[in-house]
Amino acid sequence: MLDSKFLRQDIEQTAARLAARGYELDVATVTALEEKRKTLQVKTQELQSQRNASAKAIGQAKAKGEDAQPLLDAVANLGSELDAAKAQQDVVLAAINDIALAIPNLPDESVPAGKDEDDNVEILTWGTPKKFDFDVKDHVDVGQDLNGLDFEMGVKISGARFTVMRGQVARMHRALTQYMLDTHTDKNGYTEMYVPYLVNSASLYGTSQLPKFAGDLFHTLGLVNDDGEQQSGFSLIPTAEVPLTNSARDEIYDESDLPIRLTAHTPCFRSEAGSYGRDTRGLIRQHQFDKVELVQLVKPEDSMATLEELTGHAEQILQELELPYRKVILCMGDMGFGSAKTYDLEVWLPAQNTYREISSCSNMADFQARRMQARFRREGAKKPELLHTLNGSGLAVGRTLVAILENYQQADGSVVVPEVLRPYMGGLEVIGKQ
């Protein structure tokens, strides 16, 4: 959520910055609501002041033995007026809040202009895509030929966009998770967390999935209590960013506690409501997939440097797996709702002859922290400040598996196990048909 000053002090400039990322702010409506808010605020303050003065006069009248009934009647009338004004004020504040919750973050000045992914800017490429001397198969064919990916069973058990893994392919999927967690905890200073996969709506509001992206989530129906009333349900997490970041909700940290680095491996659940017909083949876009998430909570002045660091931690995994990739900075029109600046890492997939996203690393600045009231107090200061929150995939496990199956495939259909994964797979060097 944006600082309210952006909607009060220079709304035209705010509207222009939002327009650059494709969001049209209704300036007239916001301005009208702000005028109502200010008018009602003055009115409630004046009525409160009058009621306080009348209450004091009642005490003085009673002390003198005078008839205080007229004053009592006046206080009652003032109380009714004050209640009505406060009710009006609450309605206006709720309307402003509803608008504020739908406004995306302001892009950082370093973010390039642009409308969509075609305008993203490549920062670097790493590694050289391998040249194969045989016809390259995609990960679906590689995995099925190894008897390690079973898409038909996934459909039978659950439906479209679900997959069953087995044998050494399933083991490699697990090995990737363990390797990623060990790297981030042992080398990069993250604390591993085990978090709930079901979260409440307050958590989803905190990290800005709600209210805008309710249709992208899977929601559970609440249980019916003994009185026959249905309780509030939970939602399945779309990413571990939600529970990890919400660990800071309503907290005030000491400056010395920062930075806080958290990581977790979780399944992620997404409806893919806006992806009909896209990536229907294989593991690229699933309703359920695993991811190792990275989250950092930092001081405001450190957040941009931290974005570089966090992105580097995700790049480290790709480099140690020797998977060619490129790093791009997202343009204003392609950034996520809550992001001030985002880097995407895209891994090379030879069967598609292109790079595909495998990690997205974002600096959310104080956008999430304001919703969550996640704060810290500087040494010697009385008033706490909002944290800056950052998150990124380190990495998406299924897509990493896809990249290995394609980049490490051999002419006989087997797949070489990357060296860094071999200790996690009992020393296995090659996966053959099972």
Curated annotation (Swiss-Prot):
Its EC number is 6.1.1.11. It catalyses: tRNA(Ser) + L-serine + ATP = L-seryl-tRNA(Ser) + AMP + diphosphate + H(+); tRNA(Sec) + L-serine + ATP = L-seryl-tRNA(Sec) + AMP + diphosphate + H(+). It is found in: Cytoplasm. It comes from the Bacteria. L-serine binds at residues 239-241, 293, 393. Keywords: Aminoacyl-tRNA synthetase, ATP-binding, Cytoplasm, Ligase, Nucleotide-binding, Protein biosynthesis. Pfam families: Seryl_tRNA_N (PF02403), tRNA-synt_2b (PF00587). One of its GO terms (biological process) is selenocysteine biosynthetic process. Signal peptide: none annotated. Belongs to the class-II aminoacyl-tRNA synthetase family. Type-1 seryl-tRNA synthetase subfamily. Catalyzes the attachment of serine to tRNA(Ser). Is also able to aminoacylate tRNA(Sec) with serine, to form the misacylated tRNA L-seryl-tRNA(Sec), which will be further converted into selenocysteinyl-tRNA(Sec). PANTHER family: SERINE--TRNA LIGASE, SERYL-TRNA SYNTHETASE. HAMAP family: Ser_tRNA_synth_type1. Homodimer. The tRNA molecule binds across the dimer. Consists of two distinct domains, a catalytic core and a N-terminal extension that is involved in tRNA binding. This is Serine--tRNA ligase. It comes from Pseudoalteromonas translucida (strain TAC 125). The gene is serS.
